[in-house]
Amino acid sequence: MVFAHRMDNDQPPVVTATLLVPLQNSSCAEAAEALLPHGLMGLHEEHSWMSNRTELQYELNPGEVATASIFFGALWLFSIFGNSLVCLVIHRSRRTQSTTNYFVVSMACADLLISVASTPFVVLQFTTGRWTLGSAMCKVVRYFQYLTPGVQIYVLLSICIDRFYTIVYPLSFKVSREKAKKMIAASWILDAAFVTPVFFFYGSNWDSHCNYFLPPSWEGTAYTVIHFLVGFVIPSILIILFYQKVIKYIWRIGTDGRTLRRTMNIVPRTKVKTVKMFLLLNLVFLFSWLPFHVAQLWHPHEQDYKKSSLVFTAVTWVSFSSSASKPTLYSIYNANFRRGMKETFCMSSMKCYRSNAYTITTSSRMAKRNYVGISEIPPVSRTITKDSIYDSFDREAREKKLAWPINSNPPNTFV
């Protein structure tokens, strides 16, 4: 049995029963060619031509490979370091352990997942010009590439709902930590089930290639449209509507159409800054992943491997840039996160409220263990004027009595 496959997966494989003749010399080869049907010979020649064409067009210039490697390497390092720092700061610092930061940790874990399980293999495929890890690994890499944006956009929708009820309806509904954990778990589980068809669509009958896009069959096209609507368009519209209501409430637009001054707003300034940060975070995420979904709907033909690889690498780099930008936004717009980073870098459970040096003494170690001590300092003998029968209040002596004893020339270190 001889199996002839088309490279673009448009048609099912053609199966034709032929006589297997050992091609040991040219005469036997000619005899075998005579036994093959004309249609199968055409597919065989097309397959050979496509293989040669692939080897020619799949080779990339050294400049393209070097440029892509530098940009992806910088984003990869920044994403790994930044998102790991986000998880570490929220874990160590109590000031950052809020309900909203549960969602932030979930997004950081999703960014770490795509940084480890997807992006390095995409760069490897682009730089080497072929896929060398097999069809099963191709399915796994593409699965994680579809999983993480869906999880993140629904986590962002959960944050939007939390901000909406916290600011607009603070007494009617509250997103507690248990509810936040359930919302995060639902986002991961539902999206993990929703992107399982990727295992069936991706992969190729050619072992040295991993498809960049979904196949152009009607099943692949239908799933692409459904994934674009459910995994991007609908949650994006809901996010925009919720934030529109939040912004409208912050600026206090009354029923009579009169806008109040911002200084008269009852919303705390810290919550306004949080809304600004997450609004900017949503915009960066949506604009970063929009090219990826558009490329799945409209993309170069899979046979043009060089063009498809360049387009796929470009949209992957743009979408991956959102993973590296999130820690930067947290550090710029969130003062508690900056303080948490200072506490984390101090490598101590004691919080660093000051940036200057702190003198560590025996008394300060006692204070760290919540001991309170008062050193009895004998008062200085002094002559008291007998103008009154009452002693005058001496503030300096009282302060000396309550002062900590400090040794001479104590060592200066950072907590």
From Swiss-Prot:
Disulfide bonds join 138-210. GO terms for cellular component: cilium; neuron projection; plasma membrane. Strongly expressed in the brain. Keywords: Cell membrane, Disulfide bond, G-protein coupled receptor, Glycoprotein, Membrane, Receptor, Transducer, Transmembrane, Transmembrane helix. It is a multi-pass membrane protein. The chain crosses the membrane at residues 70-90, 103-123, 153-173, 183-203, 222-242, 278-298, 310-332. GO terms for molecular function: G protein-coupled receptor activity. Its main location: membrane. It holds the Pfam family 7tm_1. Residues 1-69, 124-152, 204-221, 299-309 are extracellular. It comes from the Eukaryota. The keyword Cell membrane applies. Disruption phenotype: GPR19 deficiency induces a shift in whole-body energy metabolism by increasing energy expenditure and decreasing glucose disposal in a sex-dependent manner. Male GPR19 knockout mice show decreased whole-body glucose tolerance, combined with decreased expression of key hepatic glucose production enzymes, under obese conditions. In addition, Gpr19-deleted mice exhibit a prolonged circadian period and a delayed initiation of daily locomotor activity by causing the downregulation of several genes that normally peak during the night, including Bmal1 and Gpr176. Belongs to the G-protein coupled receptor 1 family. G-protein coupled receptor that plays a role in the regulation of circadian rhythms and energy metabolism. Participates in maintaining proper circadian gene expression in the suprachiasmatic nucleus (SCN), the locus of the master circadian clock in the brain. May function as a coordinator of aging-associated metabolic dysfunction, stress response, DNA integrity management, and eventual senescence. Upon binding to adropin, modulates mitochondrial energy metabolism via the p44/42-PDK4 signaling pathway, influencing pyruvate dehydrogenase activity. PANTHER family: G-PROTEIN COUPLED RECEPTOR (PTHR24243), G-PROTEIN COUPLED RECEPTOR 19-RELATED (PTHR24243:SF224). This is Probable G-protein coupled receptor 19. It comes from Mus musculus.
